[in-house]
UniProtKB/Swiss-Prot annotation:
Membrane topology according to the record: Multi-pass membrane protein
Family of this protein: Belongs to the aromatic acid exporter (TC 2.A.85) family.
GO biological process: malate transport; monoatomic ion transmembrane transport
Basic and acidic residues: compositionally biased ranges: 467-485
Gene: ALMT7
Keywords annotated in UniProt: Ion channel, Ion transport, Membrane, Transmembrane, Transmembrane helix, Transport
Function, as annotated: Malate transporter.
Origin organism lineage: Eukaryota, Viridiplantae, Streptophyta, Embryophyta, Tracheophyta
Annotated segments matching region Disordered: 461-485
Protein name, entry field: Aluminum-activated malate transporter 7
Ion transport as UniProt keyword: yes
Organism the protein comes from: Arabidopsis thaliana
Length: 506
């Protein structure tokens, strides 16, 4: 009984992980039920006979999870069957001309030669990537038709029936796959790359995102205000970490480890890109979409993830510099990490919306500017009294962070190439981290941490509203008080000038 419960739990977990798997299972059952009518419906059985089993076999081996995989396998199988069928008929005709004695010998030679050559060609990397299944079916079909033809007088009729049933089975798979709850490999690849961007940005930015939105004097301040708790490189390496309890430490460690899934995503990306090439245009993805460029972006993201993995090990190294040095280096390091994370986050959002990542350029430039500030600080001789072992650990970590910034710039360039090739639309300016407002409903937010857990938010709008009081530089000051109770976050906002409004967010 316990085994049954375990199987049920596993089934629920698999279905919850991706509900499309349940739909795919029903689709396979539907196609098999349709092609089985070759046996149940007498006129169809009279036409094809036992060769109807080839339609069933085609459905079983061709129907895959995504449209691209199904199309690829289906077209490969049909093409291989047609080609092998034609060659099989030709081989049988040539062998029959040699008489009863020489016919089996020649057929054996033909089967040996084509099987040996086809198997060798399967080792070619490009062929193996896209046409391995086609060659496998070619070997099987040629051998079966050649051998069957030796005992079957009407070899052409036999070949026609088998090819027809294979085509019918393949078409059934393709039609159901495309028109009944389709799963597009291209969309999955697109989402995977965007998700990888987010995982890297999560490490660099931190693991706490608080969304605050309010209405101050009937002015929509923001769609989303992101107040980052900077658990990034600067905070983690250059500040004294307080004891938050074992549960909090474990949770944060688990959140930061999300980037590790990017390290092993290469095979998944390549298979999705290969399947996506077979798919017709769908949604925002036109035919011959530049899927190869997605692989280039994914490769650079993976290189960045390896740098982050190495950096993470140095963050937890035993040899740490003194608190004074940490405080002096904290600000530029924090800016380098934060701006890189912002650029990654903006690129993720741009890719999801298929817009050009124009706002990421500013964050990359800010990160490079912080890198120059750090270089000037190091040239000032701040590390003269640091112990050699501590110095090695510190400089290695800094070098890795600089590499991350350089890779972020390369990723951005590669994403620009993808945006141009895929004809992404121009972005409507509403970046999450904009420094200057572009419209009435969008404002820039600068937070200044005060005593305890109070934060003063300086909010700047376009200056077209006279109902709200401003300070001398045209900005509004809002005092934010934040409390944490259990798992909820309560935020109270009050305008310093007029005390107009408050908001609570969970």
């Amino acid at each position: 009984m316990e085994k049954v419960r375990e199987i049920v739990r596993e089934g629920r977990r698999v279905a919850k992980e991706d509900p499309r798997r349940v739909v795919h299972s029903f689709k396979v059952g539907l196609v098999l039920a349709l092609v089985s009518s070759f046996y149940y419906y007498q006129p169809l059985y009279d036409s094809f006979g036992v060769n109807a089993m080839w339609a069933v076999m085609t459905v079983v081996v061709v129907f895959e999870f995504s449209v691209g995989a199904t199309l690829g396998k289906g077209l490969n199988r049909v093409a291989a069957t047609l080609f092998a069928g034609g060659l099989g008929i030709g081989a049988h005709h040539l062998a029959s001309m040699s008489g009863p004695t020489g016919e089996p010998i020649l057929l054996a030679v033909f089967v040996f030669v084509q099987a040996a050559l086809s198997t060798f060609v399967r080792f070619f990397p490009r062929v193996k990537a896209r046409y391995d299944y086609s060659l496998l079916i070619f070997i099987l079909t040629f051998a079966l038709i050649s051998v069957s033809g030796f005992r079957e007088e009407q070899v052409v009729k036999l070949t026609h029936k088998r090819i027809s049933t294979v085509i019918i089975g393949g078409l059934s798979c393709v039609i159901i796959s495309i028109f009944v709850c389709p799963v597009w490999a291209g969309q999955d690849l697109h989402s995977l790359i965007a998700s990888n961007f987010e995982k890297l940005s999560f490490f660099l930015l931190g693991n706490s995102f608080h969304y605050v939105s309010s209405d101050l004097n009937s002015i929509t301040l923001l769609r989303k205000i992101k107040s980052w708790r900077l658990a990034d490189f600067g905070d983690k390496y250059c500040e004294v970490v307080e004891n938050d309890g074992a549960k909090e430490v474990d949770k944060r460690k688990k959140d930061f480890d999300n980037y590790k899934s990017v390290l092993n995503s290469k095979s998944n990306e390549e298979s999705l890109a290969n399947f996506a090439k077979w798919e017709p245009g769908h949604g925002q993805f036109r035919f011959r979409h530049p899927w190869k460029q997605y692989l280039a972006v994914g490769e650079l993201i993976r290189q960045c993830a390896y740098r982050i993995h190495a950096l993470n090990s140095y963050l937890n190294a035993d040899n740490q510099v003194s608190v004074d040095i940490k405080k002096k280096l904290g600000e530029p390091l924090r800016r380098m990490s934060l701006e890189s994370g912002k650029a990654m986050k903006e690129m993720s959002i741009s890719l999801k919306k298929m817009t050009k990542p124009s706002s990421s350029d500013l964050h990359v430039q800010n990160a490079k500017s912080a890198c120059k500030s750090l270089t000037n600080l190091l040239n000032s001789g701040i590390l003269k009294e640091v112990e050699p072992l501590e110095l090695v650990s510190l400089l290695t970590a800094i070098s890795l962070l600089i590499d991350i910034i350089n890779l972020t710039e390369k990723i951005l360039e590669s994403l620009h190439e993808l945006a141009t090739a895929a004809k992404f639309k121009n972005k409507i300016e509403h970046p999450l981290f904009s420094e200057k407002p572009k419209a009435k409903s969008f404002v820039s937010v600068r937070s200044i941490k005060c005593h305890d857990d109070h934060v003063v938010i300086i909010i700047e709008d376009d200056g077209n509203n006279d109902d709200t009081s401003k300070n001398d530089n045209g900005s509004k000051e809002v005092s934010i008080h934040e409390k944490h109770e259990d798992d909820d976050t309560h935020v109270d906002a009050r305008c310093v000038s007029c005390g107009h409004t408050s908001v609570c967010v969970k």
